[in-house]
UniProtKB/Swiss-Prot annotation:
Domain of life: Bacteria
Record protein name field: GMP synthase [glutamine-hydrolyzing]
Lineage: Bacteria, Pseudomonadati, Pseudomonadota, Gammaproteobacteria, Pseudomonadales
Gene3D superfamilies: 3.30.300.10, 3.40.50.880, HUPs
InterPro entries in alphabetical order: Class_I_gatase-like (IPR029062), GATASE (IPR017926), GMP_synth_C (IPR001674), GMP_synth_GATase (IPR004739), GMP_synthase (IPR022955), GMPS_ATP_PPase_dom (IPR025777), NAD/GMP_synthase (IPR022310), Rossmann-like_a/b/a_fold (IPR014729)
Pathway(s) where this gene product acts: Purine metabolism; GMP biosynthesis; GMP from XMP (L-Gln route): step 1/1
Enzyme class: ligase
Annotated residues for binding of ATP: S235, G236, G237, V238, D239, S240, S241
Length: 525
């Protein structure tokens, strides 16, 4: 009998680092299941989780300050390998009898560490070998404190001039700590270091693969749903599309999708969704044409937050009206993904609390009285995309740029009108089409056009044109928390601008947004 894909698992304890989710994604990429839990996870829960190894993540606090986070004692009682990263190394050192102090020289950014100890973790892994035969690694540092005394039976693993104990290890106990961040791409050998810990030291088997995830998710859905019927709000976005494909494969005609066409979608998006799911895959999809209802409700409103709420409430009204026409629906499917689950863990007094269910549809009427099916709730976004490909969805659909829930409603500044939406749809289509032609679409993380309710004078032929202004926006980012504006070639911008002004009569001027995040947000509203 094949092993359950969750059988070999890693526990990651979160001490508040901005990189913690990145650690989890790296572990999953290696092919091993892991879960992120708050540092104050109780001992019994840790024992029940039964990990094959534990990673103590970084954090912003100082170990030597009162009430700073500590690793649960149960971790050190499990008898499994432990890997402390940055703060994780410091709390491990302090809790096992070592000492941590503040450092006069803080290390932030690129650094080179010398590998001075022969350990299972770093044996044969290096970026440089100097004239004296000393191995070196190019790494990313982000710390102010440092370990000044190691626990008994530990040895120095790595060092820098300002941080003599930049890494420590005990091969006998299988405990390792590094002051740098192996999870970020700036640490060139980071992937190899994590693989060494997880596959070799923890002896995990790479069971977490797209094909096995698909098989497991299909089996789980069938076990949960049985012969009951399921309702899904299909938006055409990546998450809901993958849920639709997965559920259709699992339960076939027991699935009914409601696609709400709010009049704020991209050009031909409604037709594309229906063609993909209803025509090609045979999924039962109800298309609710609610453009007038959305636009009427939005009339006269220019406040961005109020527009979002109106769009959200109207979606619920339309979705509810459609669901009431259906019989014997017992389950509501949602595209909740793992970051949603993590983020819905509250934070009081700087301490994370128990993870609770996250409802990404947000506010669907409780009187619907439906049970939830969330087949993606264990997956990160990149895993959802790989699962989509595994299920047969087209690459271009799975790797589309993100599109906001309120759609063009937040890309039209001020009041939303049908005229504005129609102009914006066409301009956006031209921009994306030219990005694809120039092989830039997948080089940027997100690209779109923003409609500005400002008119500008233009000249077309011998005539004067007084028409609207639009802005092009393209950004590059890894995590969407920070982003830089994309340095698109001038020739490409010229082509896009020329096409928009020449082909769309209502637009006379095109600008390019050169704001990064922060201080600007990616979307304008």
């Amino acid at each position: 009998m094949a092993l359950d894909i969750h059988a070999h698992r890693i526990l990651i304890l979160d001490f508040g680092s901005q990189y913690t989710q990145l650690i989890a994604r790296r572990v999953r990429e290696i092919g091993v299941y892991c879960e992120l839990h708050p540092f104050d996870m109780d001992d019994e829960a840790i024992r029940e989780f039964a990990p094959k190894g534990v990673i103590l993540a970084g954090g912003p606090e100082s170990v030597h300050e009162a009430n700073s986070p500590r690793c649960p004692q149960a971790v050190f009682d499990l008898g499994v390998p432990v890997f402390g990263i940055c703060y994780g190394m410091q709390t491990m050192a302090e809790q096992l009898g070592g000492k941590v102090e503040g450092s006069e020289l803080r290390e932030f950014g690129y650094a080179r560490v010398d590998v001075v100890g022969k350990s299972r973790l770093l044996d044969g892994i290096e970026d440089h070998i100097d004239a004296d035969g000393l191995f070196g690694l190019d790494v990313w540092m982000s710390h102010g404190d440092k370990v000044t005394k190691m626990p008994e039976d530990f040895h120095i693993l790595a060092s820098t001039p300002s941080c003599p104990i930049a890494g420590m290890f005990s091969d006998e106990r299988r405990y390792y700590g590094v002051q740098f961040h192996p999870e970020v791409t700036h640490t060139k050998q980071g992937g190899r270091i994590l693989s060494r810990f997880i596959l070799d030291i923890c002896e995990c088997e790479a069971l977490w693969t797209p094909s096995k995830i698909a098989e497991d998710a299909i089996a789980q859905v069938r076990a949960q749903v049985g012969t009951d019927n399921v309702l899904l709000g299909l938006s055409g976005g990546v998450d809901s599309s993958v849920v639709a494909a997965l559920l259709h494969k699992a339960i076939g005609d027991q699935l009914t999708c409601v696609f709400v066409d709010n009049g704020l979608l991209r050009l031909h998006e409604g037709e594309q969704v229906m063609a993909m799911f209803a025509e090609n895959m045979g999924v039962k999809v109800i298309r609710a044409n609610a453009e007038d209802q959305f636009l009427n409700n939005l009339a006269g409103e220019s406040d961005p937050e109020k527009k979002r709420k109106i769009i959200g409430r109207t979606f619920i009204d339309v979705f509810d009206a459609q669901s009431n026409k259906l019989d014997n629906i017992k389950y509501l499917a949602q595209g909740t993904i793992y970051p949603d689950v993590i983020e819905s863990a509250g934070a009081k007094s700087g301490k994370a609390h128990v993870i609770k269910s996250h409802h990404n549809v947000g506010g669907l009427p409780e009187e619907m009285n439906l049970k939830l099916v969330e087949p993606l709730r264990e997956l990160f976004k990149d895993e959802v995309r790989r699962l989509g490909l595994e299920l047969g969805l087209p690459y271009d659909m799975v790797y589309r740029h993100p599109f906001p829930g309120p759609g063009l409603g937040v890309r039209i500044l001020g009041e939303v009108k049908k005229e504005y939406a129609d102009l914006l749809r066409r301009a956006d289509h031209i921009f994306i089409e030219e990005l694809r032609k120039a092989d830039w679409y997948h080089k940027v993380s997100q690209a779109f056009v923003v409609f500005q309710p400002v008119k500008s004078v233009g000249v077309v032929g011998d005539g004067r044109r007084y028409a609207w202004v639009v802005a092009l926006r393209a950004v590059e980012t890894i995590d969407f928390m920070t982003a830089r504006w994309a340095h698109l070639p001038y020739e490409l911008l010229e082509t896009v601008s020329g096409r928009i002004i020449n082909e769309i009569e209502g637009i006379s001027r095109v600008t390019y947004d050169v704001s990064s995040k922060p201080p600007a947000t990616i979307e304008w509203e």
